[in-house]
Amino acid sequence: MKKLIFLIVIALVLSACNSNSSHAKELNDLEKKYNAHIGVYALDTKSGKEVKFNSDKRFAYASTSKAINSAILLEQVPYNKLNKKVHINKDDIVAYSPILEKYVGKDITLKALIEASMTYSDNTANNKIIKEIGGIKKVKQRLKELGDKVTNPVRYEIELNYYSPKSKKDTSTPAAFGKTLNKLIANGKLSKENKKFLLDLMLNNKSGDTLIKDGVPKDYKVADKSGQAITYASRNDVAFVYPKGQSEPIVLVIFTNKDNKSDKPNDKLISETAKSVMKEF
């Protein structure tokens, strides 16, 4: 009996190793194909299975942080209080604010701020959300409370999008970011109403159609938030992926970049990475 158990354990270990080496080889090949760097962290919240690739390497998180900021604000504000209004001044407006630029001199609700940030990736909306939380220091404090001492918010929009590989400013690792997303949104303190509100925004978001959504089976549901920094071809997507018939998501973080500051990203890199990683689940 002991020998049988030993053989079963060995078989499981070898199977896991083969699985890991399989996706690692495919992702290494993708890095060569696109002359890029890939970082991946995936967590099946149902089984606890993880898939990692360069998961402790730092990348610019760019606009994917809007999901975290929105979730932190939604922890603080009950759903029936999201009608609170904030005033928008001309000086508040930064580049790429397609919704908030229409509100100069007017008031906007917290609910509409989150909708603008998550659905249109409105940069001014993200800044206002951070300020409603209490500023960048409060965001960092909440991250530390969640056990995340890696994700490093320093700047507001749009400066946070100027990534430098020599700096840790506004960067994270796929593993740290993915675990924080899980603790904040999938298994966090959000009320039922606020969680549904945020995930519905991510599910109906169209900006990620060429990213993780493009790499998973069409009958999967994908609630995502994409991001793209201005430098080093930094292109990201973070998502809660729901396989058909599964109510507990797979948290999937894909961060990518390149070596040259002026390089341009390719969305196919992320969709092909997602396709490779999801074979493991």
From Swiss-Prot:
Swiss-Prot/TrEMBL keywords: Antibiotic resistance, Hydrolase, Plasmid, Signal, Transposable element
Biological-process GO terms, alphabetical: beta-lactam antibiotic catabolic process; response to antibiotic
Residues holding substrate: K225, S226, G227
Keyword Signal annotated: yes
Active-site residues, Swiss-Prot/TrEMBL: S63 (acyl-ester intermediate)
Enzyme kind, highest EC tier: hydrolase
GO MF annotation, one: beta-lactamase activity
Cross-referenced InterPro entries: Beta-lactam/transpept-like, Beta-lactam_cat, Beta-lactam_class-A, Beta-lactam_class-A_AS, Membr_lipoprot_lipid_attach_CS
Signal peptide: 1-24
Gene3D superfamilies given in the database record: DD-peptidase/beta-lactamase superfamily
Remaining remarks: The class A beta-lactamase family has a specific amino-acid numbering system, sometimes called Ambler or ABL numbering and often misspelt as Amber. A multiple sequence alignment was used to derive a consensus sequence and then the consensus was numbered taking into account insertions and deletions. This allows use of identical numbers, e.g. for active site residues, despite differences in protein length. UniProt always uses natural numbering of residues, hence there appear to be differences in numbering between this entry and some papers.
Family: Belongs to the class-A beta-lactamase family.
The protein, known as: Beta-lactamase
Provenance organism: Staphylococcus aureus
